[in-house]
């Protein structure tokens, strides 16, 4: 019947999501767990894979694991515009270049070249974007020629 078709369609729409992954990153990410976490998080439009690794630039999440801002600890630059960083008020994580999104996010993406993080920061006040933390996340940036030789060794660990 028509109501059953609508119900099934809405169920598919709620579960539909897309894995976006920087092509020059190798990782030990548990993609199945990441996708499951995203799909079972109501009202979340994007899930960013993050880790507690040391960096100078951190994504900042509130107690509900929702994206609030960004800080460069070397310069104390913050984003988005008007965001005020206060030490100890946020969970600070390094971004991995890996995320899961809903179709809503894909429809909001601007055309042209831009930073995906700047895009997320520009919409985080009106769209729920959460973090998925992998404490033992290992990453290798194979976009750097000197790291290409390390790729085979990196992959052999898994």
Residue ranges and their predicted role:
Residues 17-19, 26, 32-40, 53-54, ...:
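Catalytic-core segments of class I nucleotidyltransferases/pyrophosphorylases
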Residues 1-20, 79-82:
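Short phosphate-binding loop-to-helix
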Residues 5-9, 13, 34, 41-44, ...:
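Generic hydrophobic alpha-helical segments
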Residues 2, 27-28:
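Alpha-helix N-cap/loop-to-helix initiation residues
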Residues 41-52, 57:
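A short, conserved acidic/glycine-rich loop-to-beta-strand motif
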């Amino acid at each position: 019947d028509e109501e059953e078709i609508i119900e099934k369609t809405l169920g598919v729409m709620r579960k539909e999501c897309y894995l976006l992954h920087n092509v020059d990153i190798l990782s030990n990410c548990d993609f199945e767990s990441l996708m499951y976490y995203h799909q079972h998080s109501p009202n979340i439009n994007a899930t960013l894979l993050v880790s507690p690794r040391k960096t100078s630039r951190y994504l900042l999440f509130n107690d509900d694991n929702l994206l609030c801002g960004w800080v460069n600890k070397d310069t104390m630059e913050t984003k988005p515009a008007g965001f005020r960083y206060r030490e100890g008020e946020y969970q600070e994580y390094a971004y991995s270049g890996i995320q899961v999104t809903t179709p809503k996010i894909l429809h909001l993406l601007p055309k042209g070249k831009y930073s995906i993080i700047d895009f997320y920061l520009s919409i985080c006040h009106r769209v729920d974007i959460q973090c998925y933390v992998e404490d033992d996340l290992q990453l290798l940036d194979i976009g750097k020629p000197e790291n290409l030789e390390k790729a085979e060794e990196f992959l052999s660990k898994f």
